[in-house]
Amino acid sequence: MAAKLIKGAEVAAQIREELKKEVDELKAKHHVTPGLVTILVGENPASVSYVTAKQKTSHELGFHSIQDNQAADITEAALLALIEKYNKDPKIHGILIQLPLPKHIDSNKVLYAIDPNKDVDAFHPVNVGRILIGTYAFLPCTPAGCQELINRAYGDPKGKEVVVLGRSNIVGKPMVAIMIQKRLGANATVTCVHTGTPKDKIIEHCRRADILIVAAGVPRYVQGDWVKEGACVIDVGVNRVGVSEKTGKAILVGDVDFD
């Protein structure tokens, strides 16, 4: 079977169109406008870019969307007080904290301060537990996006061999928990390989995968001969490997060597 490139932009556009209809219906039938606040601490260029993109999409979908920018030297206590304000705000249904936070702030303490019912990144321990037992309302965005790509571009993963390369709290672990659920769009046979897995075993597992999800954080780590013919490969990695002499822009590559 010839390799087929999944065009994520097309899938994203389709999802945005579906969400816009849902938001319009929510407003018309229930007179409710989804409210989202994104809290940005400092001026990290990558974080600013991410938050700007989130705000743009939120406004396009018709959300009541707030971008709350705070100085990098904000105290932990002040940030916790700000979160509590939005926890109590009935117009806000979702709270996003853009990571990373400055070193003087305990990220876990901040994330755990968010009302679990407004924790749309699903980082709160309550939501992590809900994901594990399959009663979740929210999923972390990257694993959820991977699941959408698989179902829309590859097909039902039920019974398929899924290999997740990486065990981060943001991608790897929740990805495993999502794909093993006995529900539509999951119900797969899942293996997780990571830094504790010998490389020869990593290669062995990858070659067996019907669906390979790579979130290793290592540029061009997975090689073409690690992937069996017809397998679906989702490359989560975004790695900066230098600067282009022609454009002066960063050169970004994934965790899979597609060349």
Predicted regions, residues:
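Rossmann-fold NAD(P)-binding glycine/threonine-rich loop
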Residues: S107-V128, G237-D259
